[in-house]
C-alpha cells in the first residue's frame, strides 16, 4: 500500500509581540494638565504613557497591564499569546510551547502529530517512521507491506521482490536471497521451505490429494506427472497463456475411438522454488483443472478459473499461516475477471451450498 507520510499535520509559528512600556514620572510646572482617563486636573506627580497624562490611580485602574498568569503588574517588556499578556518569565515557564520529545521551548515552526507538538528536527529524527531498508526518515511516499515493513516508495523500483512473500529482497528485510531465473527471485526467509527437486513432488501430491478426499473429490490420478519449471516466461510460452502471474499449467490430451474417450493424459507444470504452501495451492488449482477434464465439464473462463482457485483457497485455509493469509488476501483483492472476480463468485456459491452440492451443480453452470 502506498501512503503519504503524516509529515507535517500542522505548522504554526509562535509570534511573541514584545511591547516596552516606559513609565515616566513627571512634575508639572506652569501649564495646566488634565488626566486623559478621568479628565480631572493633574497636580503634583503624574504618569505619561504614549503621550497622554494620567493620575497614578487612573493609570493603575485603566491602563496598567497585568499578567494573565500571575495577575501581577507588568512594568517592562512582555509577551502576548492568544489575546493574553504575560511577564516574559511567566510566559516561558508556563505558557510557551515545549517539545513533547526533548522538553525544550519551541520558538519557531513546529510539527503537530497525534495531538503532540515537536521541534521540526525532533519530529524528523524521532517521530517519523524510519525506512527499514536505508534507515533514513520517511518524509514522502512510503510503502507499508503486509509484514509490517516501512520503506521509501522508490526502493521498489530498484530492489527485486520475493516470488513467494513479495518482500523486497535485501539484507535488512530478508537476509538476502537468490535468483531462480532472469525475472524470478526468492528471499532467504522463504528459501528453507521451497519445492525445487523431483524427490519432493510425490509427498506434495499426496498431501493435496488427501485434502481433496476430505471434501469428496476422490477420483483424481494419484501418479499424475508434475514437472518443475524455473522460468515464468517458459511457462507462459508452454501454456499459451498471457496472464503474467501464471504459476502453473496443466496439459491435457485425450484419445478417442468411435467418438468415445478411451484414454486421457495429463501433465502438470509448476514454477520451481515456490514456498511449499504456495506450491501445494498451485498444485490444487491444477488438479481441479484435471477434475474438470475428467468429468468433461466445460465452464466459462470465470467459473472455470474461479472454481480451480477454490482448491488454492482450501489449501491456504488448511495452513492458516501468515504466508497463507497473505496469499488469501491477494486472492480476495484480485481484480482479474477470472482469477479474482470469478473466484469470489465461486467462493460465495461454495459458502452457501458447500462442496457436495457445488460439485453436483458444476455441469449446469
Residue ranges and their predicted role:
Residues 262-283, 295-300:
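Short pre-active-site segment immediately N-terminal to the catalytic Zn-binding motif
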Residues 297-339:
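Post-HExxH zinc-binding segment in Zn-dependent metallohydrolases
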Residues 3-30:
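Classical Sec-dependent N-terminal signal peptides that target proteins to the secretory pathway
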Residues 30-210, 214:
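N-terminal low-structure segments adjacent to metalloprotease catalytic domains
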Residues 128, 132, 156-174, 178, ...:
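Pan-zinc metallopeptidase signature
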Residues 212, 281-295, 305-309, 313:
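Active-site recognition of the HExxH zinc-binding catalytic motif
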Residues 197-266:
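Auxiliary, metal-adjacent structural segments of Zn-dependent hydrolase domains
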Residues 16, 127, 201-204, 279-280, ...:
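Hydrophobic (often cysteine-bearing) scaffold residues that line and stabilize catalytic clefts
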Amino acid at each position: 500500500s502506498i501512503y503519504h507520510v503524516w509529515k507535517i499535520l500542522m505548522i504554526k509559528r509562535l509570534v511573541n509581540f514584545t511591547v516596552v512600556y516606559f513609565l515616566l514620572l513627571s512634575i508639572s510646572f506652569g501649564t495646566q494638565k488634565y488626566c486623559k482617563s478621568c479628565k480631572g486636573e493633574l497636580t503634583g506627580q503624574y504618569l505619561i504613557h504614549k503621550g497622554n497624562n494620567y493620575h497614578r490611580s487612573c493609570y493603575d485602574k485603566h491602563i496598567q497591564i497585568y499578567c494573565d498568569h500571575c495577575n501581577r503588574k507588568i512594568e517592562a517588556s512582555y509577551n502576548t499569546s492568544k489575546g493574553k499578556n504575560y511577564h516574559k518569565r511567566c510566559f516561558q515557564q508556563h505558557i510557551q510551547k515545549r517539545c513533547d520529545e526533548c522538553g525544550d521551548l519551541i520558538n519557531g515552526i513546529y510539527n503537530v502529530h497525534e495531538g503532540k507538538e515537536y521541534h521540526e528536527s525532533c519530529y524528523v529524527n524521532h517521530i517519523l517512521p524510519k525506512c527499514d531498508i536505508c534507515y533514513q526518515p520517511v518524509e514522502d511516499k512510503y510503502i507499508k507491506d503486509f509484514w509490517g515493513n516501512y520503506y521509501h516508495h522508490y526502493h521498489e523500483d530498484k530492489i527485486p521482490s520475493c516470488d513467494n512473500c513479495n518482500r523486497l529482497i535485501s539484507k535488512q528485510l530478508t537476509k538476502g536471497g537468490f535468483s531462480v531465473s532472469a525475472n524470478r527471485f526468492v528471499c532467504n526467509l522463504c528459501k528453507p521451505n521451497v519445492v525445487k527437486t523431483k524427490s519432493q513432488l510425490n509427498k506434495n501430491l499426496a498431501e493435496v490429494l488427501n485434502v481433496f478426499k476430505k471434501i469428496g473429490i476422490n477420483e483424481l490420478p494419484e501418479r499424475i506427472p508434475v514437472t518443475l519449471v524455473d522460468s515464468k516466461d517458459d511457462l507462459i510460452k508452454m501454456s499459451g497463456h498471457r496472464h503474467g502471474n501464471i504459476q502453473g499449467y496443466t496439459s491435457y490430451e485425450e484419445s478417442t475411438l468411435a467418438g468415445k474417450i478411451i484414454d486421457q493424459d495429463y501433465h502438470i507444470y509448476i514454477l520451481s522454488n515456490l514456498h511449499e504452501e504456495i506450491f501445494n495451492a498451485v498444485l490444487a488449482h491444477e488438479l481441479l483443472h484435471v477434475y474438470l477434464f475428467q468429468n468433461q465439464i466445460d465452464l466459462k473462463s470465470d467459473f472455470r478459473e474461479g472454481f480451480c482457485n477454490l482448491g488454492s483457497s482450501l489449501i491456504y485455509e488448511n495452513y492458516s499461516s501468515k504466508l497463507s493469509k497473505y496469499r488469501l488476501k491477494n486472492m480476495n483483492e484480485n481484480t482479474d475477471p477470472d482469477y479474482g472476480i470469478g473466484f469470489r463468485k465461486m467462493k460465495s456459491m461454495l459458502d452457501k451450498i458447500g462442496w457436495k452440492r457445488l460439485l453436483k451443480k458444476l455441469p449446469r453452470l
